[in-house]
């Protein structure tokens, strides 16, 4: 993941969205004026993020998961107010988000996407994703879908599941065919934490495996980055 974080603007987009989710989590677990301010700030950042990258509209899924885990939906009001303020600003300046999305979809599907069959990239996207997040993270994700984890609805597992759902939706949209190791970075960066679900004794091994994997990919595969 570090390969693409270091050289891609998507890492900046990921940072904006990540701070938005963080502030939303703080709002959901805080109280009083701090909670209100944090929720509005979260909405401002998450609202701004969808103008950086159309795909970041899918951050609504993990955002809802954050509120569900905290069992506090009141910050949603402040977040919506903040997000609408961003939308109003861009719309007032003459940019309508849905027109931009429609044009992007048309240009993408009539351009480079024509030479990238969905039948292949629907699964190859995830192969690229595994290269980005590393085998330890990909292996650990199955624990988030375990019976005990689903029954207990533990926070960490719920967030991991939310981001997996995001990636499935992004894949089915057919607007991400190839380059998902970069395009999906704002979502995939969260999955790098998945090895925390593995036994503690394996953590050092996972860290080493991630470092070796990154070096091998950057040395043996032409990533163009």
Walk through the language-model features, giving the residues of each.
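Transmembrane alpha-helix segments characteristic
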Residues: 86-88, 151-173, 202-210
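Short acidic/glycine- and proline-prone juxtamembrane loop motifs at membrane-interface regions
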Residues: 4-13, 180
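Membrane-interface helix-loop-helix junctions at transmembrane boundaries of multi-pass membrane enzymes
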Residues: 31-32, 72-77, 141-162, 201
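Hydrophobic, aromatic-rich transmembrane alpha-helices
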Residues: 130-154, 166-171, 193-194
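Membrane-interface transmembrane helices that cradle and orient dolichyl/undecaprenyl
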Residues: 17-38
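Signature aromatic-anchored transmembrane alpha helix within multi-pass, membrane-resident enzymes
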Residues: 82-84, 200-224
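Membrane-interface alpha helices of multi-pass inner-membrane proteins
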Residues: 2-4, 36-54, 60-65, 82-86
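Hydrophobic transmembrane alpha-helices of multi-pass, membrane-embedded glycosylation machinery
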Residues: 15-23, 57-70, 189
């Amino acid at each position: 993941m570090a390969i693409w974080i270091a050289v891609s603007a998507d890492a900046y987009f990921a940072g904006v969205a990540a701070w938005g989710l963080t502030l939303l989590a703080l709002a959901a677990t805080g109280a009083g004026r701090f909670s209100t301010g944090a929720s509005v700030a979260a909405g401002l950042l998450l609202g701004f993020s969808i103008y950086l990258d159309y795909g970041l509209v899918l951050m609504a899924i993990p955002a809802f998961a954050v509120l569900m885990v905290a069992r506090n939906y009141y910050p949603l009001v402040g977040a919506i107010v903040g997000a609408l303020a961003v939308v109003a600003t861009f719309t007032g300046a003459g940019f309508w988000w849905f027109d931009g999305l429609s044009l992007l979809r048309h240009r993408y599907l009539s351009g480079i996407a024509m030479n990238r069959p969905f039948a292949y990239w629907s699964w190859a996207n995830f192969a690229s994703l595994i290269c980005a997040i590393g085998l330890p993270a990909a292996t650990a994700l199955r624990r988030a879908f375990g019976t005990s984890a689903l029954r207990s609805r533990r926070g960490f597992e719920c967030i991991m599941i939310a981001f997996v759902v995001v990636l499935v939706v992004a894949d089915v949209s057919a607007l991400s065919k190839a380059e998902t190791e970069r395009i999906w970075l704002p979502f995939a960066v969260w999955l790098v934490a998945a090895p925390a679900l593995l036994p503690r004794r394996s953590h050092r091994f996972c860290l080493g495996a991630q470092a070796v994997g990154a070096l091998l990919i950057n040395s043996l595969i032409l990533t163009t980055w």
